[in-house]
């Protein structure tokens, strides 16, 4: 009842269908409010043309599987999988592998030959699958051992065969991680570690491997793989998400250097003990050290991480150079009240007080050069950090720019910083404010500082 009264018009599950009638009988919601929800839903359907006669006569009425599985769409699925792969660790430039030096590769793990797992949830029928094993097999000879019967990995009976495969191969690829039996809608994870005996399998195979050991992680959420990060025998770590129908091809392309990884982590990877300090019932974002609460997300969390939000390595290297950027900006105020509320004591102004429309975006120009030996795609992340304040986040992502740069080439990126939008923060009371003083822009490995001050514009009384 509360949800409908608050404006929820549509429930894609059965909850409203089951409980709404009883809510009306008890007087918790009126029939008029139900009618409004129905009218809003049907209005959208009408705007979409769903009541405009025979569906097959509409512009998209005859689309079917043959339209989904065109070569262009299948290529798009492959490209999306490639771009989504994140290289987290690459010791001694172990990757990419070489078809000349790594003629036999052991492919091990419960996700090494999966199909539907790669699709994740909320997906249609795939046009076809290429598993990681099949993808790697297009480059080199493979020796396959699952190691575990599934991702739950409840026993270690198959570990001996996996170790034997690693001893015979020139390189070993472990494809581990999760699936929808562990993380999905209505399914909560028990922790952040690899399930069951997966960690034991990884460590034992890494000890047995005579060549580089590559850990490929398939999951939707973060995994605490501190053990692998700290194990020098594990040469590289890759996260592939749930890469879709072409996942196996994309993984192999990255492993053997046909594609250069350029993805970035879309979330922070926390250590396992993080969840012990984070009650499910507490959704506060800001950290509270007094009660041992670590905070949520890269914006507020204080503590160690396995891998930070935005991390993503490449097979090439990029250099950044600040070509242009303002250092001092005046924020015009437009009311006497704003002037009174924007003293040096408060050190902030409400976003509603400046004339935001009169503020042109701040232009920051950065030159990005590919200084390595391989063409690559680089995602330039731009973070802002406000002046110190208890109400402020440590940093926030204001934007990103994705550019493909050939080896030895350089491109200029223009970053438009909107003061009211990008340099404002929300305080504890939900009020958006612009902190005065020195703001830091973190652009790749560059830092640039912009100082904000106020000035009195045209007064509106």
Curated annotation (Swiss-Prot):
Induction: Up-regulated in both the abscission zone and surrounding tissues after wounding due to embryoctomy.
SMART domains referenced in this protein's UniProt entry, alphabetically: Fn3_like
Coiled-coil boundaries: none
Function: May be involved in cell wall metabolism, related to senescence.
InterPro entries: BXL (IPR044993), Fn3-like (IPR026891), Glyco_hydro_3_C (IPR002772), Glyco_hydro_3_C_sf (IPR036881), Glyco_hydro_3_N_sf (IPR036962), Glycoside_hydrolase_SF (IPR017853), Ig-like_fold (IPR013783)
Keywords for this protein: Glycosidase, Hydrolase
PANTHER family assigned to the protein according to its UniProt record, in alphabetical order: BETA-D-XYLOSIDASE 1, SUGAR HYDROLASE-RELATED
Protein name as it appears in the record: Putative beta-D-xylosidase
Listed GO MF terms: hydrolase activity, acting on glycosyl bonds; xylan 1,4-beta-xylosidase activity
UniProt enzyme class: hydrolase
Record bears the keyword Hydrolase: yes
Tissue expression from the record: Equally expressed in the abscission zone and surrounding tissues of both fruitlets and leaves.
Family recorded in the similarity comment: Belongs to the glycosyl hydrolase 3 family.
EC number per UniProt: 3.2.1.-
Gene Ontology BP annotations: xylan catabolic process
Disulfide bond annotation, renumbered to this chain: none
């Amino acid at each position: 009842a509360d949800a409908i009264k608050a404006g929820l018009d549509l429930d894609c599950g059965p909850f409203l269908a089951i409980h709404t009638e009883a809510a009306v009988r008890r007087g918790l919601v009126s029939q008029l409010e139900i009618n409004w929800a129905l009218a809003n839903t049907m209005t959208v359907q009408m705007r979409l043309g769903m009541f405009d006669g025979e569906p097959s006569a509409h512009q998209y009425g005859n689309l079917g599987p043959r339209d989904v599985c065109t070569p262009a769409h299948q290529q798009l699925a492959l490209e999306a999988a490639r771009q989504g792969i994140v290289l987290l660790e690459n010791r001694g430039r172990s990757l990419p592998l070489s078809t000349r030096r790594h003629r036999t590769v052991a492919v091990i793990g419960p996700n090494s030959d999966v199909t539907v797992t790669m699709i994740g949830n909320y997906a249609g029928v795939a046009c076809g699958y290429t598993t990681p094993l099949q993808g790697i097999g297009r480059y080199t000879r493979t020796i396959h051992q699952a190691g575990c019967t599934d991702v739950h990995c409840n026993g270690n009976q198959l570990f001996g065969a996996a170790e034997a495969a690693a001893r015979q191969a020139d390189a070993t690829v472990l494809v581990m991680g999760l699936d929808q039996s562990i993380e999905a809608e209505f399914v909560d994870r028990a922790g952040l570690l690899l399930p069951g005996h997966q960690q034991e399998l990884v460590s034992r195979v890494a000890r047995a491997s005579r060549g580089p050991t590559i850990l490929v992680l398939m999951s939707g959420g973060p995994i605490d793989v501190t053990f692998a990060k700290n194990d020098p025998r594990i040469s590289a770590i890759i996260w592939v998400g749930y890469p879709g129908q072409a996942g196996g091809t994309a993984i192999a392309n990255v492993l053997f250097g046909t594609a250069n990884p350029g993805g970035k982590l879309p979330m922070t990877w926390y250590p396992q003990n993080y969840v012990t300090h984070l009650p499910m019932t507490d959704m506060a974002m800001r950290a509270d050290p007094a009660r041992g609460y670590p905070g949520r997300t890269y914006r507020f969390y204080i503590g160690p991480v396995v891998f930070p939000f935005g991390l993503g390595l490449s097979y090439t290297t990029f250099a950044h150079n600040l070509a242009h950027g303002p250092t001092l900006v005046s924020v015009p105020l437009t009311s006497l009240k704003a002037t009174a509320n924007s003293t040096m004591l408060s050190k902030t102004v409400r976003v509603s007080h400046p004339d935001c429309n009169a503020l042109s975006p701040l232009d920051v120009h950065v030159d990005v050069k590919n200084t390595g030996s391989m063409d690559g795609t680089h995602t330039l992340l731009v973070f802002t950090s406000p002046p110190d304040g208890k109400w402020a986040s440590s940093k926030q992502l204001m934007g990103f720019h994705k550019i493909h740069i050939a080896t030895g080439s350089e491109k200029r990126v223009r970053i438009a910083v909107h003061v009211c939008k990008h340099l404002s923060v929300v305080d504890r009371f939900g009020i958006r404010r612009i902190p005065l003083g020195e703001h830091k822009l973190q652009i790749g490995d560059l830092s640039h500082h912009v100082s904000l001050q106020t000035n009195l514009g045209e007064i509106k009384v």
